[in-house]
């Protein structure tokens, strides 16, 4: 599908954590969106300056601190709108300036971009993926190599199963997937690669999925690269 924007990956660090944030920039419109900005604000503001774009909107996939901690600082600089699912906002009582609640399946315009929201609970109660043309931003719902853990308040492996089944059924194989973390694979792999290589996309029975996702003594859950 034709589009005029570019996707820029920004890897940020804080102690043991590494995250992938994304800037979606349309230089012809001098506009950009950030997805899950975190940890190192200079990396993000420097990239926006380099691209000569204004940060019109911030998309948050869920409310965990390592995905939202730069939302308000960036909003104060650029006066951006901030988007999150209404389910996530309500369950965790998330609050910040210029916060706009989204419903499932909503198509909306932000900064000149057309975006579709896809509610994908599992890792959190109201996780949300964002689809722009042929690019899907998944936060901690789907990684290239796996899916998000389901052990915190509001998490549900059953919900995660249904979210992944929904993604499998609705996202075309050519769409590129941009998660919030990596275990070694570069973000931006095509959906067809995940369908072939991500074990969570291959488990068809909910009971088997839940047992596998919640199995004991898992290692390397936070060994992000």
Swiss-Prot record:
It comes from the Bacteria. One of its GO terms (cellular component) is cytoplasm. Its cofactor is Zn(2+). It is found in: Cytoplasm. Binds 2 Zn(2+) ions per subunit. GO terms for molecular function: hydrolase activity; metal ion binding. Signal peptide: none annotated. It holds the Pfam family Lactamase_B. Probably involved in some intermediate steps for the synthesis of the antibiotic polyketide bacillaene which is involved in secondary metabolism. This is Probable polyketide biosynthesis zinc-dependent hydrolase BaeB. It comes from Bacillus velezensis (strain DSM 23117 / BGSC 10A6 / LMG 26770 / FZB42). The gene is baeB.
């Amino acid at each position: 599908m034709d589009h005029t924007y570019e996707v820029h990956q920004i890897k940020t660090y804080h102690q043991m954590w590494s995250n992938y944030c994304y800037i979606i920039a349309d230089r012809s419109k001098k506009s950009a969106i950030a997805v899950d900005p975190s940890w190192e604000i200079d990396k993000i503001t420097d990239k926006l300056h380099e691209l000569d774009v204004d940060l019109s909107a911030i998309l948050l996939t869920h409310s965990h601190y390592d995905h939202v901690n730069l939302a308000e600082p960036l909003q104060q600089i650029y006066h951006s709108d901030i988007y999150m699912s209404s389910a996530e906002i309500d369950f965790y009582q998330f609050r910040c300036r210029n916060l706009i609640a989204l419903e499932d399946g909503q198509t909306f315009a932000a900064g000149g971009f057309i975006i579709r929201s896809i509610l994908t609970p599992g890792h959190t109660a109201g996780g949300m993926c964002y689809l722009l043309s042929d690019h899907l931003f998944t936060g901690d719902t789907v990684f290239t190599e796996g899916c998000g853990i389901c052990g915190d308040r509001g998490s549900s492996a059953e919900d995660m199963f249904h979210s992944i089944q929904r993604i499998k059924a609705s996202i075309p194989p050519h769409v590129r997937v941009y998660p919030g973390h990596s275990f070694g694979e570069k973000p931006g792999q095509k959906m067809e690669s995940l369908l072939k290589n991500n074990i969570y996309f291959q488990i068809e029975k909910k009971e088997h999925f839940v047992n596998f996702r919640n199995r004991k003594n898992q290692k390397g859950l936070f060994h992000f690269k």
